[in-house]
């Protein structure tokens, strides 16, 4: 299990050396990170700092990030004996007096952009079985609570498939005495349980802040709306939400058929990040930084969809059909802790029961070697689609799902084999330019055909849960 140490930092330029005491380790240092690092020996360290540490001497935001990163790295090299670290520069807000310039530096934007940006950056770096150590000692104002929320949100998704432990630290407050001993306390030490409560993705990825000149708002929004990748993302919305729903509601066939790969989602995320950064305006003379855009909940949900895709992908199970054996594998891995997995067990047990007790050998021979609608196997009529019914049957709704029966001889009796496969009726699946649609064509008793967009129904219930 890999050990990761994460720490949000405020302005480290004024930190003084003290003695930090942690579980038998005493370390004289300007940061609590030193003692924790020596004790736990992490594989990787991530330090989150704010762009508010910049001197704002360039109009280019890339220069601002580079400046802050170099400033932080120099502090680490000069004061802390740690290796294998990475500095992540996040957006910050506030007004700060800079003694060197004898001037107030002003950073305007939305405070929650810190959460969104840190969520995005850490989602790319966390994976596998993890032991995450979070040191909140040096976080400024909103940083500790938002960093904790980021870590918790990501780890609860990571725990769907991995073993995850979270340990949180904070030290005694520094009161200005030289050589004083500050104890580092363990605030929390927990095994993270998986959360399947992932929100569906809405279209509020980016919006204009109140700091934009009114005459610029229309231009900025048009720029976002006309962006080809963001336009494509809007079209992909139902596919992404179908994938999220497959995890939330434990729907094996929806997972395998409508899985959206992390690489595809990452392209959209990078495009949104690019739009966000390109609309940061800096006035080096007046020392003012303004963010014209802020991240909405749609962006946060997209990051979580990316992370869920990253941790949940089982390549051999991303396909249009699944055997009963493969469905059981999903039930015991991705959906192991999901309360909705009971529906999977019920449906598969029902199929075994129907085939093994209600079909004679000669009847089975007539349907072997063909894909057969489940409603016919159940000797029932096709029904109009109802989303609640779809979820209650783990996505194996009889009117849209087909079965390819395989049998085996058990003690002289022909029974259903775990090699039996399920899929959605191919006549209802459409794909164009990488976008899938799931359209059920239902004919009522009067012969009238109604087309039902199943992904739309899945999305509606996900967004309204």
Swiss-Prot record:
Top EC class, one word: hydrolase
Gene3D superfamilies listed in its UniProt record: SSO1389-like
EC number: 3.1.-.-
MF (Gene Ontology): endonuclease activity
Keywords: Antiviral defense, Endonuclease, Hydrolase, Nuclease
Region forming the signal peptide: none
Family: Belongs to the CRISPR-associated Csx1 family.
Subunit organization: Homodimer.
NCBIfam families documented for this protein: cas_MJ1666 (TIGR01897), CRISPR_DxTHG (TIGR02549)
Protein name per the record: CRISPR system endoribonuclease Csx1
This protein's encoding gene: csx1
């Amino acid at each position: 299990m890999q050990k990761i140490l994460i720490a949000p930092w405020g302005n480290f330029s004024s930190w003084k050396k003290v003695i930090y005491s942690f579980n038998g380790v005493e370390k004289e240092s300007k940061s609590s990170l030193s003692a924790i690092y020596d004790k736990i020996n992490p594989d990787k360290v991530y330090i989150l700092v704010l762009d508010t540490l910049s001197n704002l001497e360039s109009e280019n935001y890339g220069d601002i990030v580079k400046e802050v990163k170099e400033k932080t790295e120099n502090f680490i090299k000069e004061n802390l004996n740690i290796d294998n670290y990475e500095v992540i520069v996040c957006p910050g807000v506030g007004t700060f007096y800079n003694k060197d310039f004898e001037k107030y530096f002003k950073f305007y934007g939305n405070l929650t952009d810190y959460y969104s940006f840190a969520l995005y950056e850490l989602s790319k770096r966390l994976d596998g079985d993890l032991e995450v150590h979070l040191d909140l000692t040096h976080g400024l104002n909103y940083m500790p609570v938002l960093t904790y929320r980021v870590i918790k949100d990501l780890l609860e998704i990571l725990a769907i498939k991995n073993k995850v432990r979270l340990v949180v630290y904070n030290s005694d407050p520094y009161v200005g005495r030289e050589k004083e001993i500050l104890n580092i306390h363990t605030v929390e030490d927990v095994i993270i349980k998986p959360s399947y409560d992932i929100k569906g993705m809405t279209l509020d990825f980016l919006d204009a802040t109140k700091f934009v000149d009114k005459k610029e708002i229309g231009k900025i929004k048009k720029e976002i709306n006309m962006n080809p990748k963001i336009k494509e993302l809007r079209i992909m919305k139902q596919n992404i939400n179908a994938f999220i729903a497959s995890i939330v509601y434990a729907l094996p066939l929806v997972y395998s058929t409508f899985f959206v790969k992390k690489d595809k989602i990452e392209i959209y995320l990078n495009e949104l990040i690019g739009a966000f950064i390109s609309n940061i305006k800096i006035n080096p003379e007046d020392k003012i930084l303004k963010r014209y855009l802020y991240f909405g909940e749609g962006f946060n949900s997209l990051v979580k969809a990316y992370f869920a895709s990253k941790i949940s992908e089982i390549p051999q199970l991303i396909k249009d059909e699944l055997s009963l054996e493969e469905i059981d594998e999903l039930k015991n891995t991705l959906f192991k802790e999901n309360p909705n997995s009971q529906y999977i067990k019920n449906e598969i047990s029902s199929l075994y029961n129907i085939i093994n007790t209600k079909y004679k050998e000669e009847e089975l021979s007539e349907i072997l070697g063909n894909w057969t609608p489940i409603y016919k196997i159940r000797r029932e009529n096709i029904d109009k689609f109802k989303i609640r019914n779809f979820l209650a049957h783990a996505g194996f709704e009889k009117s849209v799902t087909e079965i390819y029966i395989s049998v085996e001889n058990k003690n002289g009796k022909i029974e259903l084999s775990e090699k039996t496969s399920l899929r959605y009726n191919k006549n209802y699946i459409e794909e164009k330019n990488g976008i899938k649609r799931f359209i059920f064509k239902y004919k009522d008793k009067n012969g009238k055909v109604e087309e039902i967009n199943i992904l739309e129904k899945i999305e509606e219930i996900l967004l309204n849960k």
